[in-house]
Amino acid sequence: MIKKASLLTACSVTAFSAWAQDTSPDTLVVTAIRFEQPRSTVLAPTTVVTRQDIDRWQSTSVNDVLRRLPGVDITQNGGSGQLSSIFIRGTNASHVLVLIDGVRLNLAGVSGSADLSQFPIALVQRIEYIRGPRSAVYGSDAIGGVVNIITTRDEPGTEISAGWGSNSYQNYDVSTQQQLGDKTRVTLLGDYAHTHGYDVVAYGNTGTQAQTDNDGFLSKTLYGALEHNFTDAWSGFVRGYGYDNRTNYDAYYSPGSPLLDTRKLYSQSWDAGLRYNGELIKSQLITSYSHSKDYNYDPHYGRYDSSATLDEMKQYTVQWANNVIVGHGSIGAGVDWQKQTTTPGTGYVEDGYDQRNTGIYLTGLQQVGDFTFEGAARSDDNSQFGRHGTWQTSAGWEFIEGYRFIASYGTSYKAPNLGQLYGFYGNPNLDPEKSKQWEGAFEGLTAGVNWRISGYRNDVSDLIYYDDHTLKYYNEGKARIKGVEATANFDTGPLTHTVSYDYVDARNAITDTPLLRRAKQQVKYQLDWQLYDFDWGITYQYLGTRYDKDYSSYPYQTVKMGGVSLWDLAVAYPVTSHLTVRGKIANLFDKDYETVYGYQTAGREYTLSGSYTF
């Protein structure tokens, strides 16, 4: 289960006094400042998901993991592999920065937002999730929050697993990590997942031809990593992974034209790095390369037919980051460089393009008595829109032992994507979308309950929108988002409880109308316990009302979508110390609901799996 540590420990061993909870060590995170620090020293709300959590929940997709977390609202055009969006605290899907091992997800470069329905869950060993602005550390996209998916495996050994389930779901996975001498270790993984799916039935959205077929998903994944410790302080690594996905979906049909209802995605990523981990100084230099090819085509004609579309992007990055322990805290500085290139036709842009971005940043964290101060500033120089600066600052006050008040303010931005700049309807004069955010929070430990309550406001300006009359994109939109987030976890005897509540009022600041596809309220509850060696888990999620557009007729009408309560039940049993069997029922009461208007969800689903470790 997710545990929130509340020991106010230091960047060094003696820097911070204890902040009363349990005696377990404080969880270390790397996403906030790009280097390890105790989670309790991160003033922004931070959640960590481990591989053990994912196995306990028996999640078969990254979206199933993220939907359980505070502030996250997932929408999807159907089942596995179908187009999905992540909304964090009411911001746009394009306002979420997704990192893979600290490197920006390549697929987000074309559309402007990350679709994690395509990313293999088998690669995920850990997720670090931070709410609030982080552009002052990472640059573009980090308005609503940052999701950092970490693929590095910590435990040596070999695991073989297999699973089966509803809609002909099947999954086979083999992974191993082995030591080669005292200083070198190698990790390998292979994964195969397939489901026939079901008919997502996009009512009225498929044109004049009904598509009563199953919309399935197939994914094949390979991963490899080599790590070596040269000395106690110096280490290096080389890592690579790739996946080959095929998705069938319901597409819009025009008589006499090919029906582009199949997606084929190839993606590969490679990175290498050198790290220095001294007592006072830490430094790392990391380079990466990724290449994605995303086809949409009619299977009767093939993906190389002239009717098919291809989005192809290559991304190159170099990151140099440094962190120095100073007093009761640290100062960090770094520079990162990114280059993205596309082939002609990508993002409906006739010519290929080349975009470069160089960012320099400074971070600081310091403890002064009962106060904790955190700050960051960054300047980006982009080949398309020039220079842009962001900054953020936070302060925490432990006014009573075990209780803390936190206040923060930050600016962030989102760069225009390829299609908005250079597409047929593009505008090369677009500016970045800009955000100003305020947050106040109380957190503490009361009678064994570890809790946090936050209130926030986010004003987003220069939002890019499409004008139906001029057929162009412009920076004229504004959004005003207000929200409250409450989280708590506690134990009652053998039962472990994790609960969160989100209230989000996300509105168009010009028309005062609700932003589409955001649930106004969410309640999430996780209950875990062990009984006679059986590990049980119950997940509850309430999704409140939301609004969407009915695109089946013009002019498009706004529709209100009702709320729903969902229950999952999971159980695991260790047959031996090496063999574990698991079973799960998702959507236990078979609720009929939609998160995108016109696209059905799966209903009740069953899965059965087993894993053998040695």
From Swiss-Prot:
Annotated residues for binding of Ca(2+) 2: D213, D215, Y249, D250, D261
Keywords for this protein: Calcium, Cell outer membrane, Ion transport, Membrane, Metal-binding, Porin, Signal, TonB box, Transmembrane, Transmembrane beta strand, Transport
Binding site for cyanocob(III)alamin: L83, S85, N92, V110, S111, A251, T309, R517, Y551
Domain TBDR beta-barrel: 155-614
Signal peptide: 1-20
Pfam family of the protein (one): Plug
Motif interval(s): TonB box: 26-33
Residue ranges annotated for the TBDR plug domain, each copy included: 38-152
GO BP field: monoatomic ion transport
Cellular component aspect of the GO annotation: cell outer membrane; pore complex
Membrane-crossing segments per the record: 158-165, 169-178, 184-195, 217-227, 232-248, 263-277, 279-296, 309-325, 328-337, 353-369, 371-381, 385-400, 403-417, 434-443, 449-458, 473-490, 494-509, 517-529, 535-550, 558-572, 585-596, 602-614
Cross-referenced InterPro entries: B12_transptr_BtuB, Plug_dom, Plug_dom_sf, TonB-dep_rcpt-like, TonB-dep_rcpt_b-brl, TonB_rcpt_b-brl_sf, TonB_rcpt_CS
Position of sequence motif TonB C-terminal box: 597-614
Membrane topology: Multi-pass membrane protein
Subcellular location: Cell outer membrane
Residues engaged in binding Ca(2+) 1: D199, Q211, D213, D215, D250
CDD domains: ligand_gated_channel
GO MF entries: ABC-type vitamin B12 transporter activity; metal ion binding; porin activity
UniProt KW tRNA-binding keyword: no
Family, as annotated: Belongs to the TonB-dependent receptor family. BtuB (TC 1.B.14.3.1) subfamily.
Biological role stated in the UniProt entry: Involved in the active translocation of vitamin B12 (cyanocobalamin) across the outer membrane to the periplasmic space. It derives its energy for transport by interacting with the trans-periplasmic membrane protein TonB.
Name of protein: Vitamin B12 transporter BtuB
Protein species of origin: Shigella flexneri serotype 5b (strain 8401)
Lineage, opening ranks: Bacteria, Pseudomonadati, Pseudomonadota, Gammaproteobacteria, Enterobacterales
